[in-house]
Curated annotation (Swiss-Prot):
EC number: 3.1.1.-
Cross-referenced SUPFAM superfamilies: alpha/beta-Hydrolases
Record carries keyword Nucleotide-binding: no
Gene name per UniProt: Lipm
PANTHER family: LYSOSOMAL ACID LIPASE-RELATED (PTHR11005)
Protein name per Swiss-Prot or TrEMBL: Lipase member M
Residues with glycosylation annotation: 48
Residue ranges occupied by any AB hydrolase-1 domain in the UniProt entry: 92-392
Length: 422
């Protein structure tokens, strides 16, 4: 066994070395050629979330929110839009939650008329954007250091159980409102399905749940990334350790910004961005590519990746399996992982799905649709893949305007299960 692990370790290092050699070759080739067209790096590639918001001419606020288990999360806010710069009293509150390896910048990476965060602010909403524990902006804890394994002992279980309640309660306390609209994307929807089905008191604080590229199960996911997740847990730990996964170091951030600034590498850059979720290249603004790669991947824990590995293998929405009945009993009060029941969620829910989405696969979506008790609206966009929901050029026309319409229609919707037409 030790010999096998040693070989895997050697292979992984060889892959890294060859990758660096390839990157160095591309860099040297581009620099020496001189005549290759180069795009100037967008200044937003070097900004944090608050700086991007201000750069676009919007008011920006940033807060730190402490969770019950000690993590300190960064939360960004756009309190009003460009057309409403004066304070005019309270506005309906919206919380946007990014997906796996994402951050709050995912909602503001495009131009203001193409980014959901800015569109909602201009439509009269008070916009808040979360950052899950372990990503670029949420790497603090009251007692733990990021150098400790204990800091990274979390998955989307804890994000649903601790992060969402902490952020939602903070927002309600800060704004004086009683309920929020929740918009989740990818893993952000997984957090919502778990939190709102297991914590009724939290679910009562949600006016309406908008699920973009929803993921409850990944039984039929066909992304190349899910093939990697079929590896045994031990193999994943050997390859990536026990702490953080795909945290973007300053070196690689600068490297990706440079590479995606080379016009000749546009196709390669777009392929890398789209590789995990499916291809719909013509629907992306590639002039923003260096902004995308400067902030994503934003990192998570290896344990979170292990949890997704377990989800791929089980085909179910379950709590993290800690590897022994004793540890599961300690963490979950039962010897086997809890199986979450989406049917227990009563929040009015609207969903948008993509026919070419490799992660939120249509077959998994079909199962999910049958389990959402209070589904008020569903729209499938046949040619859309995974990232279209946050970066697609036609996202405002095909999804965002419908979200705003439902939000403004919400006070007049009948209580209980209903269907709406747009």
């Amino acid at each position: 066994m030790s010999e096998i692990l040693s070989r895997v370790w050697t292979v992984s290092h060889r892959v890294e070395i060859w990758l660096l050699i390839l990157v160095a070759y591309l860099l040297q080739r581009n620099v020496n050629s001189g005549h290759l067209p180069t795009k100037a790096a967008d200044p937003e590639a070097f900004m944090n979330v608050s700086e991007i918001i201000k750069h676009k001419g919007y008011p920006s606020e940033e807060y730190e929110v402490a969770t019950e288990d000690g993590y300190i999360l960064s939360v960004n806010r756009i309190p009003r839009g460009q057309t409403r710069l004066k304070k005019e009293g309270s506005r309906p509150v919206v919380l946007l939650q990014h997906g796996l390896l994402g951050d709050a910048s995912n909602w503001i990476s495009n131009l203001p008329n193409n980014s959901l965060g800015f569109i909602l602010a201009d439509a009269g909403f008070d916009v808040w954007m979360g950052n899950s524990r372990g990503n670029t902006w949420s790497r603090k804890h009251k007692t733990l250091s990021i150098d400790q394994d204990e800091f990274w002992a979390f998955s989307y279980d804890e994000m649903a159980r601790f992060d969402l309640p902490a952020v939602i309660n903070f927002i309600l306390q800060k704004t004086g409102q009683k309920k929020v609209y929740y918009v989740g994307y990818s893993q952000g929807t997984t957090m919502g399905f778990i939190a709102f089905s297991t914590m009724p008191e939290l679910a009562h604080k949600i006016k309406m749940y908008f699920a973009l590229a929803p993921i409850a199960t990944v039984k039929y996911a066909r992304s190349p990334g899910t093939k990697f997740l079929l590896l045994p847990d031990m193999m994943i730990k050997v390859l990536f350790g026990r702490q953080e996964f795909l945290y973007q170091t300053r070196f690689f951030r600068q490297l990706f910004i440079y590479l995606c600034g080379q016009m000749i590498l546009d196709q390669i850059c777009s392929n890398i961005i789209l590789l995990l979720g499916g291809f719909n290249t013509n629907n992306m603004n590639m002039s923003r590519a260096n902004v995308y790669v400067a902030h994503t991947p934003a990192g998570t824990s290896v344990q979170n990746i292990l949890h997704w590995s377990q989800a791929v293998n089980s085909g179910e929405l379950r709590a993290f399996d800690w590897g022994s009945e004793t540890k599961n009993q300690e963490k979950c009060n039962q010897p086997t992982p809890i199986r979450y029941k989406v049917r227990d969620m009563m929040v009015p829910t609207a969903m948008w799905t993509g026919g070419q989405d490799w992660l939120s696969n249509p077959d998994d979506v079909k199962t999910l649709l049958s389990e959402v008790t209070n589904l008020i609206y569903h729209k499938n966009i046949p040619e859309w893949a995974h990232v279209d929901f946050i970066w697609g050029l036609d996202a405002p026309q095909r999804v965002y305007n419908e979200i705003i319409h439902l939000m403004k229609q919400e006070p007049n919707l009948p209580q209980g299960t209903c269907r709406v037409k747009l």
